[in-house]
Swiss-Prot record:
Pfam family, one: CASP_dom
Membrane topology field: Multi-pass membrane protein
Entry's family note: Belongs to the Casparian strip membrane proteins (CASP) family.
InterPro entries, alphabetized: CASP/CASPL, CASP_dom
Key words of the record: Cell membrane, Glycoprotein, Membrane, Transmembrane, Transmembrane helix
Keyword field contains Cell membrane: yes
Naturally occurring in which organism (per UniProt): Arabidopsis thaliana (Mouse-ear cress)
CC per GO annotation: plasma membrane
Segments on the Cytoplasmic face: 1-7, 67-91, 158-175
NCBIfam families linked: A_tha_TIGR01569
Name used for this protein in its record: CASP-like protein 2C1
Residue intervals annotated with topology Extracellular: 29-45, 113-136
């Protein structure tokens, strides 16, 4: 059980690291070029999906830090209610990060390819550093989402090991 707890702590630390690194890459990235004697600046604020992804990453990183803090102070969960809550929040966080990353990737693909119908130019020909940093941020976010899926499975194991395998939704101690 101790190894499982250590694994959960390491996973949460890695998730926080990847999410904060992604937030820094997205939030601090901007590039200015002179195009036809006009200074053009591009940043994450021009892409709504990247802005939403930044906020999602910060909130989920804060949630994982709170979970680490609860584990640090040995807040032992004797009943199943806090474990259910933790399990559902871990699941929700994993799904939200994956969905936000997928939306940001789709929006970024529009920036890479352009769209004649929407009069979007291909930004990556002009703003290459911006595009490479956004691409690396999206890859790091997918890694964080995969780690969160693994963390959710550990959370599910911690929850369902309390229940009896013979009686439906009965604690092992009461059967």
């Amino acid at each position: 059980m101790v190894k499982l707890r250590e694994t959960e702590v390491i996973l949460r630390l890695c998730i926080v690291f990847f999410l904060l690194l992604t937030s820094c890459l997205i939030g601090l990235d901007s590039q200015t070029k002179e195009i036809a004697y006009i200074h053009k600046n591009v940043s994450f604020r021009y892409l709504l999906a990247l802005e939403a992804e930044l906020y999602i990453d910060v909130v989920v990183a804060a949630y994982n830090l709170v979970q680490l803090g609860l584990g640090w102070y040995n807040v032992e969960q004797k009943t199943s209610n806090p474990k259910w809550f933790s399990y559902l929040l871990d699941q929700t966080a994993a799904y939200v990060v994956f969905a936000g990353t997928s939306a940001a990737a789709q929006h970024s693909l529009l920036v890479v390819t352009g769209s004649r119908e929407l009069q979007w130019m291909k930004w990556c020909y002009k703003f290459t550093r911006f595009c490479f940093q956004m691409g690396s941020a999206i890859i790091l976010n997918y890694i964080a989402a995969a780690l969160m899926v693994l963390l959710s499975s550990i959370s599910a194991f911690n929850l369902f090991r309390l229940y009896s395998p013979k009686r439906f939704f009965r604690f092992k101690s009461s059967s």
